[in-house]
């Protein structure tokens, strides 16, 4: 079978390397490629992708757009974002990755979620499934945050530091930090947190600062990616536990 990841940009993705190594170790004759699709070309290119590939993963900024072209699962419908597709059906495995990556960790409230895109939707849905009720969303545009359609309080980005100061947990669902940028959160506000979670799967300044300041629980996106990838392979019907652990644990855990 043929798989790929679609996004823009997508050159930073470690998915092709990991999945192809997994296929090799498991003795599977599958391939996993990369398709960089600018937003303005999406409607044309997605039709080709659906014809050419058995399955694919969608990342920023395409998780919400994909919904229009696939038959979404119940979870994906509620989240309004798809990150895993198999033969015309769309799933959201991000939220599963969030829940599993937080096993054994108490998510203390209030919880601040930075961002209002596809990843934010999955994080909020996961938190609600875990019984978290007091969720505060901080986003650059208030209108986009309102469109989330979840029971959350909404704040603008210029309120981020004062909101974090009153919170116990912080989830960054944006790409801020991928290139070394920092969220506008003071050290004093960060220090008062119990949990810091960043969906970016390598160490961002937020994660480094939280560790240095002694935040009790600091979770990188690599754990979310690990469990999300496991779920993807199960959906595609090609999960092999031993090969998965050999390849994915080596890199991600």
UniProtKB/Swiss-Prot annotation:
Identify the catalytic residues.
63 (proton acceptor)
* Enzymatic reactions: shikimate + NADP(+) = 3-dehydroshikimate + NADPH + H(+)
Q: What class of enzyme is it?
A: oxidoreductase
Q: Which GO terms describe its molecular function?
A: NADP binding; shikimate 3-dehydrogenase (NADP+) activity
Pathway(s) the chain acts in:
Metabolic intermediate biosynthesis; chorismate biosynthesis; chorismate from D-erythrose 4-phosphate and phosphoenolpyruvate: step 4/7
- What processes does the entry annotate via GO biological process terms? amino acid biosynthetic process; aromatic amino acid family biosynthetic process; chorismate biosynthetic process; shikimate metabolic process
Alphabetized, the UniProt keywords read: Amino-acid biosynthesis, Aromatic amino acid biosynthesis, NADP, Oxidoreductase
Q: Does the keyword Methyltransferase apply?
A: no
Entry EC no(s): 1.1.1.25
Quote a single Gene Ontology cellular component term: cytosol
The entry's NADP(+)-binding residues are 115-119
The UniProt similarity line reads: Belongs to the shikimate dehydrogenase family.
What is the official name of this protein in its record? Shikimate dehydrogenase
Q: Which organism is it from?
A: Thermotoga petrophila (strain ATCC BAA-488 / DSM 13995 / JCM 10881 / RKU-1)
